[in-house]
Amino acid sequence: MVGAKAGPSPGTSLGLAQQHSGGSSVLVKSPFCQVCCCGPAPCASCCHSRWPSLTASTCSRLFYILLHVGASAICCLLLSRTVVERVWGKTHRIQMPSGLCAHLFGLSDCPVLSGSGAVYRVCAGTATFHLLQAVLLVHLHSPTSPRAQLHNSFWLLKLLFLLGLCAIAFCIPDEHLFPAWHYIGICGGFAFILLQLVLITAFAHSWNKNWQTGAAQDCSWFLAVLLATLGFYSMAGVGAVLLFHYYTHPAGCLLNKMLLSLHLCFCGLISFLSIAPCIRLKQPRSGLLQASVISCYIMYLTFSALSSRPPERVILQGQNHTLCLPGLSKMEPQTPDISLAMLSASIMYACVLFACNEASYLAEVFGPLWIVKVYSYEFQKPSLCFCCPETVEADKGQRGGAARPADQETPPAPPVQVQHLSYNYSAFHFVFFLASLYVMVTLTNWFSYEGAELEKTFIKGSWATFWVKVASCWACVLLYLGLLLAPLCWPPTQKPQPLILRRRRHRIISPDNKYPPV
């Protein structure tokens, strides 16, 4: 074949692209990488010469993350009152042109192109886009399958399809969109919160098991466990002090004080149970590292909840004061704290991206029941990876491959990356479907979506958002307590002592020694 000498190995992403396209290298080297946009070749083939280690699945994951970030940024711009005023010159409610609206719907009441309605429509398009791909990629186990091209290729067509879905959503009138899609978004948002809680507890549990395995063998790993534990407890303690300083006041904020005190008690409870003798009897690897990670996450959820509640107004010395939020303890009107809103939004979106990538990886490693299996995994040797090591996937690939006879002169099996996916494509898109719904309801204040604005979402807050985040914090505590206490309810395992006694009873007696020693 032409170009066979310079052709790449089958294990690279460029080799996969040539396999999909029939082995021709001319197709991959076409100008402007048009095959990456419209054809079956993955985008990794365009930049393989500069980044040889970039695989098709990794490149696709980065592209999907960029698509989700772009869609979320568009939602924030359409929800921002400041952007609407400066770009369109109107205070609110930018509607579709009446002529186009009458031609499409035959109605004078046109859909709104800004505000919560626009956020619902954009997120409806992105959620539908990922849900369709999740359904089409179910039970996909090989990147060489034709269905894998749907995930790794045809980017221009997929972008046009996504824009078409969003355009169709903007053509749906409000009375048909909001009632059904609002409840779908609430259910999807709660499901994504539960998924985040499972992932953070599994992350802490696996990290602790990983490094505790090394601590039992080497003192350097014990030092790493100690430093990481002190670091997370320090962050949790500093966070608690800052929350008491900025979110409480001697004259009010009783709810904030009670909530902070309760959550600090939760942190102390899970720390005590993590090293309790009854817990360590069933879970010898249990320690303070996982409790410190959960305590730090509890403090983050507490900060997120307190920053989402409306301010409290009290009368002190005949003057009206606004309390319980940073920078609102004085009588004078103040500008909103944009830095606090940006910090809260950045942490929230970082958790969203972590959940989307980690869930798809664990689903490929452990299978459909990864939520249960990830807690029972035992590390054979420690590694710097905080979650499950890469050897899990390699072992899985070795078990899945067919055994070859020793005398058969055939080339060795291809690398694991060619045989198996690095993450589950279907789970990846399904988690992004839930993430789109979660971003939608978070930006629009969950239950009170009417009149939602970006400036109010992360600054003024609402009671609905406050109680949702408080409930998610309590659910995290209950999930971790269940993880610690569940092994206590399991029946005790049989010990091998009866087998040893049975061997002693059936000992053979030689003729020279009629009475064996007892």
Swiss-Prot record:
Its main location: membrane. One of its GO terms (biological process) is phospholipid biosynthetic process. It comes from the Eukaryota. Keywords: Lipid biosynthesis, Lipid metabolism, Membrane, Phospholipid biosynthesis, Phospholipid metabolism, Transmembrane, Transmembrane helix. It is a multi-pass membrane protein. Belongs to the TDE1 family. Incorporates a polar amino acid serine into membranes and facilitates the synthesis of two serine-derived lipids, phosphatidylserine and sphingolipids. This is Serine incorporator 4.
